[in-house]
Amino acid sequence: MKFLDQCKIYIRSGNGGGGSVSFRREKYIEYGGPDGGDGGRGGDVWIEAVEGLNTLIDYRYQQHFKAGTGVHGMGRARHGAAGEDVVLKVPVGTEVLEEDKETLIADLDHAGMRLLLAKGGNGGWGNLHFKGPVNQAPKYANPGQEGEERWIWLRLKLIADVGLVGLPNAGKSTFLAAASAAKPKIADYPFTTLTPNLGVVDLSSSERFVLADIPGLIEGASEGAGLGTRFLGHVERSATLIHLIDATQDDVAGAYETIRGELEAYGDELADKAEILALNKIDALDEETLAEKVAELEAVSGIKPRLVSGVSGQGVTELLRAAYKQVRIRRGDLEEEIDDDEDHVDETPGGWTP
C-alpha cells in the first residue's frame, strides 16, 4: 500500500429540501386548507478516526466529497427525507487543518473520535406552517437552506511510542527489522527509506511498543534539502527518540550536531524530547577505533552512547528496554527517576504534550 500523509480535500454538506406549496384536495371538500410538507435537511459531512488505516492514500484519488440534498416536501403534509451523510474515514493520528494549512481544527488522536466538519442545511417549511387567521391559504413556502462548503487539509502524524532519527544510511531500517517483525526496504545507498515505517516491538507478552523509522535527515533539511523535515511530524507524539549514528563514518560528532540542529529548526519542542543516543554498526569496527568514536561522541553530546549493531543484534535488546522505560514514564506506569541509565538518556522533555 502506498503511503500518503497529507492531502487537501473539498467538502460540502447537503442543501435542505424546499418546502411544498400544496392544498388538500378531496371529494366533497371544495376548499381544503394548505397541506404542504417540510423539506428534509441536508446531509452532514463527518470525519472519523478508525483503526486499521495508516495512510491517506484513498484521498489521492477522490478529493471532492458532497453530502446528499434533502428531499423536497410534498402534499398531504408529507415531509422530505434527510440527505445522506458523508463520513470520511481516516487513520488515528490525523490532524484536520483549515485551508491555510496552519489553523488546527481537530486532532483525531484516538479511535472512534468523530467530528462534524460541515452541517447540512435545514429543510424549508411547507405552506402548512404559514396558515393563519389572516392568510388561511398561503401560496408560498420556504426554500431549503444552503449547505456549507470548505477546503481542508488532512495531515497524518503516525502514533508511535518511539521514533528513530538519524542521517541517511545510519542503519535505521536495519535496526527496525532487527527489533520488530517489520520488513522495510534495506539497501546500501542514502534515502532507501522514502516513507515512514512502523514496527511493533515485543519485549515480552506484556511489554510492547510501536517503533517508527522515518526517512533520514541531512544538513539543511529544515530548508528543504533532501526529503526535508516533513516526516518529523510522525515522531512528534513519541515518548522518546532513538538517535542512531553510523559508527563507521568519519565525523560522528558532526553527524550528531547535524541532526540536533534539524530537530531544533523543526520546532514543536521536538529537540526537547527525551533522547537515547546510540552508535550503530559497531560490528564493523575494532575496539580501539570504537573507543575513539565513543569518546568523540560523548564529548560533543554529553551523553554516553549505547553500542548496538542492527546486523548482529548486539545491544539491540538493551537499547529497546531503555526506550520502553521512557514509554512507561510517558504512559504514567513508571515514575521518572535517575538510575544507571542516566548517562545514556537525555531526559529534558520540558513538559511536552502532543
Swiss-Prot record:
Its EC number is 3.6.5.-. Transmembrane segments: none annotated. GO terms for biological process: ribosome biogenesis. NCBIfam families: Obg_CgtA, PRK12297.1, PRK12299.1. Belongs to the TRAFAC class OBG-HflX-like GTPase superfamily. OBG GTPase family. Site-specific mutations that are activating (168-Val) or dominant negative (173-Asn or 280-Tyr) in ras-like proteins do not have the same phenotype in this protein family. This is GTPase Obg/CgtA. It comes from Caulobacter vibrioides (strain NA1000 / CB15N). Its main location: cytoplasm. One of its GO terms (cellular component) is cytoplasm. It comes from the Bacteria.
